[in-house]
Amino acid sequence: SKKNFLSSNEYQPLLVLDVDHDNNLKINNAVLSEEGLVGRVTNLGFLSAEVMLVQDVRSSIPIISSESSLHASLKGMGLGRKGELNFIKKTASFREGEKLYTSGLGDVFPQGLLVGEIVSISDPVDSEFLKIEVSFFSSPINQDYFLIHAK
């Protein structure tokens, strides 16, 4: 699908894609680029599909890590920003450089779609959780074409 519009709202960016009117698309279909997961379809029009991006602050993606096989929830923090893994206990064995994939839990995204990579892990003294930052592999800013994964 071709990009029609990308809003400038940093925290709740909206991507609109042109689609054929005789498509079999559904709400929550995954949207992909060559680099990995971009987001999910949140609204369908006659010739368009609205996409909530993985960077959206309302986005929460169930992931699994490539090396430690740990599950977590990846939260968007805004377009152009890193995402964060939420509520990770300090005993967890995530590693910097680990790639993160969709886990398939929740039945929104299929299992195994590449999402991002852990770029930093810190241990704040004022929290019982680790602060884990994730770099998203895919951004819609410099791309014009996307694939909508129909279930």
Where is each model-derived feature located?
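A secondary-structure micro-motif
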Residues: 1-151
